């Protein structure tokens, strides 16, 4: 057994200082005040934190590799890099690309799902695109953004039975047909990379869209049209009590007051911090292009 002492332990109840954590047989068997009578190998954390492993629902790559490199070595490299940063479970996320590249990504994921070295880390696939707005493609390749095609989506599902989530621009989903199709198959539908305004987003949130992909990034807030202010997608999201939102809380994508605002309006149970990490994460690269 291993005993961690002088730890700041993060639990669902908050942070507890100067606590002891005992680990045995790869399980946490005790958390509390120091148990000096227990014979264990002891590690003094000197006030450092102990936390449950992180979960990342939106991650493309890291350590110089991408999940869409289409080889097992790169796939493992990404998973192991994030594991070292404390992320024990993640959702490999695709990029908008040509369909043959998306097929290869889905086929590779299916192979890795049975790979002993990474299978316990995988939570399913998050498909980000290709049904995104070309006006709000952000770092995605707008060349491959396209309107919703349910038949094409079924081909994705045929390639991989573990697709758990798909990001779609609601205005690209006429009548929200794909949202209904996916929800019938217990797949989460996330609004993102969207050029829509308040009315369309409100309808989407009432028609199966249950998550928001990297809120504020690649979407509209208050928009001036013909000299008048119009509520945007962001206002629709903030006024909806049920939808969960992603935030990239890296101190770069969003300033602290924005995160504080979302927390005040959405509450902790409807906010998901994600990395949206790409291949340059964890490297010394000064320039990097997503997907390349």
Positions of PLM-derived features:
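Divalent metal-binding pocket/active-site signature
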Residues: 127, 135-231
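Divalent metal-dependent hydrolysis catalytic cores, especially in the metallo-beta-lactamase
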Residues: 60, 76-105, 120-133, 160-171, ...
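Active-site loop-to-helix "anion-binding N-cap" substructures in soluble metabolic enzymes
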Residues: 64-69, 92-101, 171, 218-230, ...
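Histidine-rich, glycine-flanked metal-binding segment
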Residues: 1-3, 9-51
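Active-site-adjacent C-terminal substructures of enzyme catalytic domains
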Residues: 200-292
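Residue-level marker for buried hydrophobic side chains located in beta-strands
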Residues: 53-55, 190, 273-274
């Amino acid at each position: 057994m291993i005993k961690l002492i002088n730890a700041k332990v993060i639990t669902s109840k908050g942070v507890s200082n100067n606590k002891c954590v005992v680990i045995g047989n790869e399980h946490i068997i005790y958390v509390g005040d120091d148990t000096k009578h227990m014979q264990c190998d002891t590690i003094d954390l000197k006030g450092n934190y102990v936390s449950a492993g992180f979960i990342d629902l939106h991650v493309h790559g890291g350590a110089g590799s991408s999940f869409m490199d289409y080889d097992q070595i790169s796939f493992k490299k990404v998973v192991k890099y994030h594991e070292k940063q404390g992320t024990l479970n993640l959702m490999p996320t695709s990029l908008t690309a040509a369909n043959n590249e998306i097929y290869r990504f889905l086929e590779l994921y299916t192979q890795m799902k049975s790979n002993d070295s990474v299978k316990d880390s995988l939570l399913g696939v998050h498909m980000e695109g290709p049904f995104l707005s070309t006006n709000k493609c952000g770092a995605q390749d707008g060349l491959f953004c396209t309107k919703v095609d349910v038949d094409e989506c079924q081909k994705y599902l045929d390639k991989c039975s573990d697709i758990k989530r798909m990001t779609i621009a609601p205005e690209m989903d006429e009548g929200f047909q794909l949202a209904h199709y996916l929800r019938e198959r217990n797949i989460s539908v996330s609004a993102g990379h969207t050029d829509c305004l308040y009315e369309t987003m409100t309808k989407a949130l009432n028609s199966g869209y249950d998550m928001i992909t990297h809120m504020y990034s690649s979407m509209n807030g208050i928009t001036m049209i013909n000299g008048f202010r119009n509520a945007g997608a962001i206002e629709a999201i903030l006024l909806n009590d049920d939808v969960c939102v992603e935030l990239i809380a890296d101190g770069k994508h969003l300033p602290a007051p924005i995160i504080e605002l979302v927390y005040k309006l959405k509450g902790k149970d409807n906010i998901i911090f994600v990395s949206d990490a790409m291949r340059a994460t964890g490297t010394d690269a000064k320039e990097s292009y997503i997907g390349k």
